[in-house]
Curated annotation (Swiss-Prot):
Region (M domain): 156-284
Keywords: Cytoplasm, Kinase, Phosphoprotein, Phosphotransferase system, Sugar transport, Transferase, Transport
Annotated source species: Escherichia coli (strain K12)
Taxon lineage: Bacteria, Pseudomonadati, Pseudomonadota, Gammaproteobacteria, Enterobacterales
Protein name, as recorded: Multiphosphoryl transfer protein
Domain notes from UniProt: The PTS EIIA type-2 domain is phosphorylated by phospho-HPr on a histidyl residue. Then, it transfers the phosphoryl group to the PTS EIIB type-2 domain. In contrast to classical PTS systems, the fructose-specific PTS has no requirement for HPr; FruB combines a IIA domain with a HPr domain.
One biological process term in Gene Ontology: phosphoenolpyruvate-dependent sugar phosphotransferase system
Gene name of the record: fruB
Every HPr domain range: 285-375
Length: 376
């Protein structure tokens, strides 16, 4: 994981416009020995090609491929502008993270930062922070509680099972492996009868042994009988804060609407969307899957091209990295798209709902096939 030094963070700075802000960041990169004097020209040129504004008040100015020879060593400089700097199209940046990288070394850092910065509350804290130490803690995620663990790694779907104990053991093992529970939780979760929520869904938890919030889901290939009641899926919850409540509410809503069968039929990505997103696909949604061929995945430039393509349409569009966490993201947010951690060869599923959904998916597919501004 990239380590950010407080010496690389500059709180309380001022800039009259975007160009002045970029020049300040470039000068700091030169001073730190990251780049030569000519790198600033690449940073300004990059901004002319594609805005480096990520969203949530964050911009990531960096050079073009033509100025990679100006990079002496990979590094970043973070500038905070409490009064804000207009970054174009009504966008205001309060934090600019200047990046110097000669290859794709910065992509891991970028994904690390976007996972932190995609939290709206953290972005607001970055704006109001007053010290380099506070900014560093926010950027490195040290002030964040661990996010709810519910992704592809927590799912066991369509297994051969004829009793709840099999599902209980699988979920307990997943939670233990994720560091979410201790041995006490595992013992209780396996020995105590889960709660029947109805429609084939059962729930398991424990008041003891919760180390972090996480949810594991196991689903049988075929429903089976438990003392005259139907069982098909078990949801096991480790609760160390209130994060699981939102998931349980979505689950309750599906049950109240008699739509729990959607969970029993869904693939992994759709199941995660139903439990973790308020923008989960409905029955009338269209979807399509495409493979990213860009050498360095979806970093800022191709990510921007993708988001700009999506913004041409009125439909609600989400994107899921099927080779990542499996959670859907708002396709109109560059920050959330970059945070998906898309690498070359990863499969993306797009869902679109609206009058122009079909046209949107075709345009997205064409844009990806064309290389998202980097050539096919």
């Amino acid at each position: 994981m990239f380590q950010l030094s407080v010496q690389d963070i500059h709180p309380g700075e001022k800039a009259g416009d975007k160009e002045e802000a970029i020049r300040q960041v470039a000068a700091a990169l030169v001073q730190a020995g990251n780049v030569a004097e000519g790198y600033v020209n690449g940073m300004l040129a990059r901004e002319q090609q594609t805005s480096t504004f990520l969203g949530n008040g964050i911009a990531i100015p960096h050079g073009t491929t033509d100025t990679r020879d100006q990079v002496l060593k990979t590094g970043v400089q973070v500038f905070q502008f409490p009064e804000g700097v207009t970054w174009g199209d009504g966008q205001v940046a309060y934090v600019a993270i200047g990046i110097a990288a000669s290859s794709d070394e910065h992509l891991g850092l970028l994904r690390q930062l976007t996972h932190v910065l995609s939290d709206d509350s953290v972005a607001e804290q970055l704006k109001s922070a007053t010290t380099a130490e506070e900014l560093r803690a926010l950027l490195m995620g040290e002030k964040q509680s661990e996010q709810l663990k519910l992704d592809n790694e927590m799912l066991t779907l369509d297994i051969v099972a004829s009793d709840l104990l099999t599902l209980q053991a699988l979920n307990a093992a997943r939670l233990k492996e994720a560091g979410a529970v201790d041995a006490t939780f595992v013992t209780k979760a396996i020995n105590e009868q889960p709660l029947n929520l109805g429609q084939g869904i059962w729930l398991s938890d424990s008041a003891e042994g919760n180390l972090r919030s996480a949810i594991a889901v196991s689903r049988a290939a075929n429903a089976f009988d438990v003392d005259g009641e139907t069982a098909a899926m078990l949801v096991s919850v480790a609760m160390n804060d209130d994060q699981p409540i939102a998931v349980l509410k979505r689950l309750a809503d599906l049950l109240l609407d008699n739509k729990a069968d959607r969970l029993l039929k869904a693939d992994a990505a759709t199941l995660l969307a139903l439990l973790t997103s308020d923008d989960a696909p409905t029955d009338d949604v269209l979807s399509a899957e495409f493979v990213v061929r860009n050498e360095h995945g979806l970093h800022a430039r191709p990510g921007t091209m993708l988001v700009n393509t999506i913004k041409q349409f009125n439909s609600d569009i989400t994107v899921t990295n099927l080779d990542g966490t499996g959670k859907p993201a708002n396709g109109r947010s560059l920050m959330k798209v970059v945070a998906l951690g898309v690498k070359k060869g990863h499969r993306l599923r797009f869902t679109a709902q609206g009058a122009d959904a079909e046209q949107a998916l075709k345009a997205i597919g064409d844009a990806i096939a064309a290389g998202l501004g980097e050539g096919a």
